[in-house]
Amino acid sequence: MNLFSLLSVSASGMSAQRARAEVLVENLANAETTRTPQGGPYRRKDVVFAAQSQISPFASIYQQELGPHVAGVEVAEVITDTREPERRYIPGHPDADASGYVAFPRMNPAEDMVDLMGASRGYQANVSAMLAVKDMINRALDILR
């Protein structure tokens, strides 16, 4: 693995953490949304990551012995919560049913805030790794001068 592929790994990590943060911010913004264009309350979303595989001719020949070469991380899918919404008794609410109950998203904003902090820290870790690789490349170029 060369230094430039390390930059690619860090860049993919930054991109994945950015996507995770965007989904978490969407969850927080819609924590009290009772009506969506699809009907019903907002459904919480989660990001699922997967390893990117680096396929090279050498790796394809010796993949059995060496194992797959990981080239970063990617967003495999964004899953939507399938649990039943939380029902609250608010009889005067415009979205209340005949019994006076309103369906709200089943989510915990504090949990999403903690996850958002984790995404931010993951992004920062990838930036630090990218800066370290950049420094290594610059030092290697200095040696050649």
Where in this protein do the model-derived segments appear?
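Amphipathic alpha-helical polymerization modules
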Residues: 1-145
